[in-house]
Regions:
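Acidic/proline-rich low-complexity IDRs
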Residues: 1, 13, 159, 163-167
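Signature for HUH/AEP ssDNA processing cores
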Residues: 2-131, 136-152
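A common structural junction motif
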Residues: 151-161
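Catalytic "initiation/cleavage/transfer" segments centered on a nucleophilic residue
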Residues: 161-194
Length: 194
């Protein structure tokens, strides 16, 4: 499940039933999304997120909070620390692969621990330098409640190895009526930097 195989699954290969499930699990806002541009950065797009965009060749992300500050999922985002990543060009391929293996093994350990607690969760290679572990809610819940829960989950996890970073999504308890909060990249995307 945590294999870094870029061609093992593709969002373009999903059938209609799987596409509907994907949207149900991951899309909380359809009026805005983030799109990765050529240099690897993301740009906010304030237009409807259509199936053509979501399941096309673009790399896109979702904003967790809806306009009422409710969420439908949570995510642990394990990455190689930015300071280490900034030195990637001076590393050998083997050194970089060791960092990828470190984040992979730590994510596997956390996933196994969460499974031992009977906490349903789903890992994925997020592309480039890390992994996500997703949690799906039975119904939309206030982001503040989900943030408290995900912070509690983080406190239960094995200690982070030096050189790794962990982000929690959602990152906000609430947003203003015209706010967006942070986004997280959808699964099955091709990271333009990798």
């Amino acid at each position: 499940m945590l294999n870094k195989q870029k061609d093992s699954h593709s969002k373009n290969d999903l059938n209609a039933k799987d596409r509907d499930l994907f949207k149900q699990l991951f899309i909380n806002r359809t009026d805005v999304y983030a799109c990765q541009v050529a240099n690897g950065d993301y740009s906010q797009v304030k237009s409807p997120l259509t199936d053509e965009i979501l399941f096309g060749d673009q790399t896109v992300g979702t904003y967790n909070l809806d306009r009422n500050s409710y969420v439908i999922n949570a995510c642990l985002d394990f990455d190689i620390d930015k300071k280490i990543h900034e030195t990637k060009d001076s590393m050998s391929a083997d050194e970089w692969d060791q960092w990828i293996q470190t984040v992979k093994q730590h994510t596997k350990s956390c996933f196994a621990y969460l499974q031992s607690l009977d906490i349903p969760c789903y890992p994925e290679f997020s592309g480039y330098k890390g992994y996500h572990i997703w949690f799906f809610l039975d119904k939309p819940m206030p982001a503040a409640d989900v943030r408290r829960w995900i912070q509690h989950i983080r406190a239960l996890l094995p200690a982070m190895p030096k050189g790794l970073d962990l982000e929690l999504f959602p990152k906000q308890d609430k947003i203003s009526a015209d706010g967006y909060g942070n986004f997280v990249k959808f699964p099955l995307q091709v990271n333009r930097k990798s």
